Amino acid sequence: MSHDEVRSCWLCERPLGSKVQWHHPVPKAKRGRETVPVHPVCHRTIHAHFTNAELARSSGARESLVKHSEIARFLAWIAGKPPDFHAPTRRPR
């Protein structure tokens, strides 16, 4: 899929807004090359909850991230928000 064909966020699957960031499911530091489109708030949430090593161990699988309780909670909360919704990202304690 080309960057021009992107219509939904890789993490939350909501339609994308005017701002799109490109996330490496397997971090570049771990030799990941693929990128996927995400909302900025979704991108910050991923990196707030997972280290690069944890992301690399997941092998870029969305399913392994959404099983995480905090990510599942975030996805339920963000589901009804508009595509360009912005909110501060809370880091786990």
Which positions does each model-derived feature cover?
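N-terminal leader/targeting segments and the first structural element of proteins
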Residues: M1-H3
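Histidine-centered nuclease catalytic patch
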Residues: E5-P37
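Long, charge-rich low-complexity segments
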Residues: H86-R93
